[in-house]
Amino acid sequence: SYGISSGCFGLKLDRIGTMSGLGCWRLLQDSP
C-alpha cells in the first residue's frame, strides 16, 4: 500500500494536481 501511496504522491506533484493524490488515497481506503 505504501508503494502505491508513494506513486500517488508523485502524481500529485505532477501537472495533474492534488485531485490525483486525493483519488489515490480514496482508492487505498476503498481497497482491502
UniProtKB/Swiss-Prot annotation:
UniProt-listed GO biological process terms: blood vessel diameter maintenance; regulation of blood pressure; vasodilation
Disulfide bonding pattern of the chain: 8-24
Location relative to the cell: Secreted
Highest taxon, organism lineage: Eukaryota
A Gene Ontology molecular function term of the record: hormone activity
UniProt-listed InterPro entries: Natr_peptide, Natr_peptide_CS, Natriuretic_peptide_brain
SMART domains: NAT_PEP (SM00183)
Alphabetical UniProt keywords: Disulfide bond, Hypotensive agent, Secreted, Toxin, Vasoactive, Vasodilator
One term under GO cellular component: extracellular region
Family: Belongs to the natriuretic peptide family. Snake NP subfamily.
Other remarks in the entry: The hypotensive effect is not mediated by the natriuretic peptide receptor-A (NPR1).
Identification of the protein by name: Natriuretic peptide Coa_NP2
Protein source organism: Crotalus lutosus abyssus
Top-level taxonomy: Eukaryota, Metazoa, Chordata, Craniata, Vertebrata
